[in-house]
Amino acid sequence: MSDLILEVGGVGYPAHRLILCASSEVFQVMLMNREWSEWRESRIILQETPTGASVFPHFLKYFYTGQIRISHQTVLPVLSLADKYNVKDLVTLCLSYMSQHIAQAAKRGQLIAWMQYTMACGHNDVAKACQNFVKWNMEWVVDSELAELEDDTLLLLLQHSDLVLHNEMTLYQFVVRWLNKQKERLNTSDLSESELKAHWDSLVTTVFSHVRFPMMCPNQLAKLLLCPLTQEHKEFFMERMAIAMSYQSGQYERIAEVQETESGRMLFTPRLYTEDTWGLVLAVDNFHSLPCYHTRTFIFSTRPSIDDVAADKLTEWTVDLYPKGVWFRKSMLIVWAATYDVPEVVLRTVRISITCQNCPEQQDNNYEYCEYNEPDVRVKIGILVWGVQNGVEHVASVVERVHRFSAQNRRCPKCSDICDPPEPKHLLGPNRDQLRIQVVIVPLTDFCHVGASETIG
């Protein structure tokens, strides 16, 4: 016999005080503390959202059986109930499920909701995993999710330099899609016409302030002149495009002025652009049949700068990929004072070595010097490791490095260990035997704002 009825959404669920108190700290306080009116009631009405009410019977059953069936559709409302009533073991279960099904959530248009909820509730590990998926796979964010993407969340994403994009124009188009969804929502609001216009103008200028127009080529900037949004907010966009053209034409004094402003601090820092101009996809097929310590060498070129000043030049790169680790054989180190034995070392990780083949030599007397020109090559290197989760192929992890190459320092030692020996989640294709890694190399100038190099994901 139950001694309590919990009413949710007009439906009564028989329950037992002892079971509820043993499973939930919130129910324990509610039902045992005399300061709460519910402690003496035999029927308690709980206010839940419609989605919370739909999963409440399963939530309550978990108190008795310790088992619950969750899916990509129900995990968020179950987690919200577990958070609300402080059912810690169920919270852990839901977060574990979410971390293993992030790609599926993206495919089914639920990732933004997962990301924003976990960010708000302090579930930092899952929130970071969701953010990383969005940053590195923005093409998976469908229009239906854009309506749910909050202003502050979008602004947070736009400030990151490790967004993986085809180019900056891709991000511009993403923001336009988001604004179109916001306009639909605003048109159904109760705001007056003047309030609606003020809010819309503020929204446009705020979000586009974080789009890095200087990273667009002149042809892309010219196309933007014809966009309706540009015509509608002509003063704002003309100013941003003028800054972009100053960068593209090498007007360094003007760039330095803009960089000193709060809104211009990050404008001249490239993101991780995947178009052919900036890198190469390294695909290793038949992974399982490769011998240990196998090496693949790839050669490609990138532009030495994002601006058009040196558009006719190329920087040549050689990438050595070790998909099954490296074997450093025993050797001998001879120095002036003594001789040392260097022991054998075997590293099982996937490793990459990057070499710049045409670093500029020391400047000659005919070189036209500018205080912003540098005789070496400073770049940001992005190593994108692909993976598969629930049948969804995506960028699963990113290694980001900043390095300065020169005639005396042609190789980057920082891009060594990319990931542990590939697990099934890192192997693609119908036979799960392809390792896919994309190398992105974007040039940096003194106007770029970059932090310490770090491994992400």
What are these regions (language model features)?
Residues 25-40:
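Cytochrome P450 catalytic domain signature, combining two hallmark sequence patches
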Residues 45-47:
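Alpha-solenoid helical repeat scaffolds
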